[in-house]
Amino acid sequence: MNTFEIINKDFRECEIPVGLVITDPPYNQDYSYNQYKDKLKVNDYVELLSKIPQPCVIIHYPEETINLLPLAMKSQCEQVVTWVYNSNTGKQSRLISFWGCKPDFKKVTQPYKNLKDKRILQRIADGKTGARIYDWWEINQIKNVSKEKTEHPCQIPEEVIRRIIQTTAKEGELIIDVFGGSGTTSKVAYELGYNTISYEIDPKYCEIAKKRIESVNEPGSEVSQDTL
């Protein structure tokens, strides 16, 4: 049985094990978190991002992905996926950047679009289930009326994390989130059969994450003081 661990600490104070980090860091946009001031000086913010271990997949707004992440990582990313969504604000997309790892889009398929095309019909006859997904993902944001919605102010849709894991993670690889939030990364990883660790400084969000993961099925780990 796979296991999960929720650690109520700043990841910078911990020894991070080897694994694939999938995370959406605080965006430095002055979001209202319980125990974190989301408005650092640029240099301090870059320093925070630089502590994210590689290999990693980082979800961020386009400006920060282009301008700040290369400074923090001291390199260029291997691949970028654009995640787009409908929004009433000016921000209608985020970039998913891959550092020290690369997605294999053939691992996830989408339905064929032109079912009258002879080539498509032949592929279906050959047992193909669909076309590989693109590097452009249209997935709705989590809104207040969304079934997935928790008390966390900035929540990533489970489908975004699911595609990242399915296209990028190796079999048996440990999935890590260093900005755990409401536990979406660990919940999806746990559902998919991966062992997972989530680091989060806010005990309230840790408790939300724990309940979400335990709702999948019987939890696979005992919970200590550090892991709530």
Identify what each model region corresponds to.
Residues 2-199, 204-206:
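Core catalytic lobe of class I
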Residues 209-210:
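Conserved SAM-binding loop
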Residues 213-228:
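Class I S-adenosyl-L-methionine-dependent methyltransferase module
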